Amino acid sequence: MHFVPTMGGLHHGHASLISAASCHKSGDVETLVSVFVNPLQFGPNEDFARYPRTFEADCELAELSGASAIWCPDESQIYPGGSAESWRIQAPKSLQSRLCGSTRPGHFDGVVTVVCRLLALAKPHQLFLGEKDWQQLTILRRMVLDLGLAVRVRGVPTVRDGDGLASSSRNRYLNAQQRQQGVLFAQVLSDARSACLHGGTALKPGEVKRRLEEVGLSVEYVDVVDPWFLQPSKSNQSSLTLLAAAVRCGSTRLIDHAFLMTRSPLVAIDGPAGAGKSTVTRAFAERLGLVYLDTGAMYRAVTWLVLEQGGDPGDSEAVDLVLNDLKVELEPLQQGVQVVRVNGHEVTDAIRDPRVTASVSAVASHACVRAAMTAQQQRMGKAGGLVAEGRDIGTAVFPDAELKVFLTATPKERARRRALDLEARGHEVPALPELEAQIVERDRLDSTREVAPLLQADDAIELISDGMSIDQVIDALEDLFRRRVGEEVWPTPV
């Protein structure tokens, strides 16, 4: 079951959520929409009593959007002992010390408490939430992760009305003049995003606040934070950050945000040989519409050419001579396969030969090779929109990548996979213990070489793939990506 929790007052934004949940259905999966105005989310003097309650209209919109059923529990079903006496979950302080959490104490504790209760009752497989309230989405993602709940969280892009104002149940409170102010609110944030993307310079929060006040808005906060940690970003300005703000138009509180970036997102996937990086990275790139940069293939291409010309992989001077005339080309993925060419010759299968595999570590250890390949890879990734896999992508090639993953598996598992790959390619398959010993030795060489050793970046997330299918690994990578990069920043291809 796919689940869309709401507080009612459904609008175009909710319709988009329900439609997304319905479009992801397969087989006998159903889409459930809940309507429950949660008292724990409202503070003193907030609008709990007058919050829109339009159940009949909600049912109609939900059905038209693809919902299988609508669930409208009463308070006693959600909080059997009453909301005042119910068990409560506390969201981490670091996730609610800024943005809306800084001015609405207890609000997100109420959100995580009710959603945890709804999930326990409904038991869905996937939970669909809007990216409009990014802080809420992030906190709920952390709740699911930290509590080990068996549900996958999916974010859906912010929906805007024709005039640019983000869809909200509270928009109906606005008169014509206030609505125009709300439109200007959205425009100021959009202008800040454009200035960063095209000019490379982000407006300071103080400047954004000044512009909002100039159009008559009462500003509650303007802040720039890391999209996952919801604290000021420590990365350089190439990385993605979240510009978020809350204002009041009359008595109506509005929130909105924009993602600031100077390029499209980058993903760096590192890990030891045989961890399945190439297989899953190719499929991940296709699913997300990212360009696939197979850096391992580039090093294999150099190694192949060295061997083809009779050179010694351990002789740096001989290898350097090969680099003078080297031209490596990686063609776009076609049905999961990336064609590799060296100086015009197609070598896609040749670079996977065991001779190349045995020598690639020695060739890649030369400083001249690393420098040449790193420079070429960085040129290819300058505009972003790319995923690369290798040994030092997150530490040397793209240290400012939005997502860094260290994908690994035990030597025994990697030996098993290597045997299957060799068999599929028609090569002779050594005994598994021999393959495992080769992998352990390769790890040692890669981790101890002087130039660009195999290392896990400090901010990389380790993903151990033993016992996981390829699809499960790709799902895990997609979820990690979406923690930081929303659908409204990089939409999943249809």
UniProtKB/Swiss-Prot annotation:
Main location as per UniProt: cytoplasm
GO cellular component, one term: cytosol
GO molecular function terms listed in the Swiss-Prot or TrEMBL record: ATP binding; CMP kinase activity; dCMP kinase activity; pantoate-beta-alanine ligase activity
UniProt binding sites for (R)-pantoate: 41, 136
Pantoate--beta-alanine ligase: region residues: 1-258
GO annotation, biological process: nucleobase-containing small molecule interconversion; pantothenate biosynthetic process; pyrimidine nucleotide metabolic process
Subcellular location: Cytoplasm
Keywords in alphabetical order: ATP-binding, Cytoplasm, Kinase, Ligase, Multifunctional enzyme, Nucleotide-binding, Pantothenate biosynthesis, Transferase
Positions of the UniProt region annotated as Cytidylate kinase: 259-494
Function: Catalyzes the condensation of pantoate with beta-alanine in an ATP-dependent reaction via a pantoyl-adenylate intermediate.
Protein name: Bifunctional pantoate ligase/cytidylate kinase
Organism: Synechococcus sp. (strain CC9311)
Classification lineage: Bacteria, Bacillati, Cyanobacteriota, Cyanophyceae, Synechococcales
